[in-house]
Amino acid sequence: MRGQPRPKLRRMTEQQTGTPQLKQGFAEMFKGGVIMDVVTADQARIAEAAGATAVMALERVPADIRKDGGVARMSDPKMIREIMAAVSIPVMAKVRIGHVVEAQILQAIGVDFIDESEVLTPADEQFHILKRDFKVPFVCGAKNLGEALRRVGEGASMIRTKGEAGTGNVVEAVRHARAVLGDIRAVQSRPAEELMTVARDLQAPYDLVQYVHAHGQLPVVNFAAGGVATPADAALMMQLGLDGVFVGSGIFKSANPERRAQAIVRAVTHFQNPDILAEVSEDLGAPMTGINIDELIPEARLASRGW
């Protein structure tokens, strides 16, 4: 329940993977939690001790990917295995958009979730991975409802806002969350006979548009990501109506990662309690410096990757 400490989520077994129902059910277990980017086993242990629901194993956090430039690819499987061995909570890892072989490799080494991520350099500018062909569940980013439903149609078990990863600036995550939730309200307001036209305009599967019309939500879990850097940022995304939060560079690029990780977990749990939010926001040390979105040239905007 929201406002209550959540039970610790464990790694999946082989028997728990495979069908869309099992994959989406596993994703539901992350609701109300925080998923943290980590680049070492020690960071993964810090995240687990802080109460993270899962960790995202990668060689460079998004802020470093931005700074270093070049082609960003799937992380070394050896590094991912080391992180998997260090913690008992689920471990996620990223693949490039459209790179089916990277996804096959991650499934083979036993990761619990794959992020088909715009943070990495896209491998295919026309097609995303057909995620339903995999036993392991996928999470994908989206800027609007049409994009979210296309990813679900391909088999994604979780959606997240794209935001602008590595900036420490939550404004784009807020924009994308409001866009998706606003589009959902707009679909709900349309009469049933107009839904085929809505599906055409959204470029989304008709049956998924029908689901949104009937239920007023996405068919899968909807998380915030991209620029979350403070407990207040995390609570803001929860108050907007999202199901949980990914935090990338915001923790381990800050002055006190342990305290900030704990504070963000508490903020997500108690996102409607200003007294607790004030308490957990105190004395955290300096956050990551951050980047103003207006300073990014179009080519540096990661959210524009994918379609």
UniProtKB/Swiss-Prot annotation:
Functional pathway: Cofactor biosynthesis; pyridoxal 5'-phosphate biosynthesis
GO MF, any single term: amine-lyase activity
Leading EC class: lyase
UniProt entry keywords in alphabetical sequence: Lyase, Pyridoxal phosphate, Schiff base
Catalyzed chemical reaction(s): aldehydo-D-ribose 5-phosphate + D-glyceraldehyde 3-phosphate + L-glutamine = pyridoxal 5'-phosphate + L-glutamate + phosphate + 3 H2O + H(+)
Biased composition (Basic residues): 1-10
EC number(s) stated in the UniProt entry for this protein: 4.3.3.6
Domain of life, source organism: Bacteria
Active-site residues (renumbered): K94
Organism: Deinococcus radiodurans (strain ATCC 13939 / DSM 20539 / JCM 16871 / CCUG 27074 / LMG 4051 / NBRC 15346 / NCIMB 9279 / VKM B-1422 / R1)
Gene label: pdxS
Disordered, as annotated region: 1-20
GO biological process: amino acid metabolic process; pyridoxal phosphate biosynthetic process; pyridoxine biosynthetic process
Name this protein carries in UniProt: Pyridoxal 5'-phosphate synthase subunit PdxS
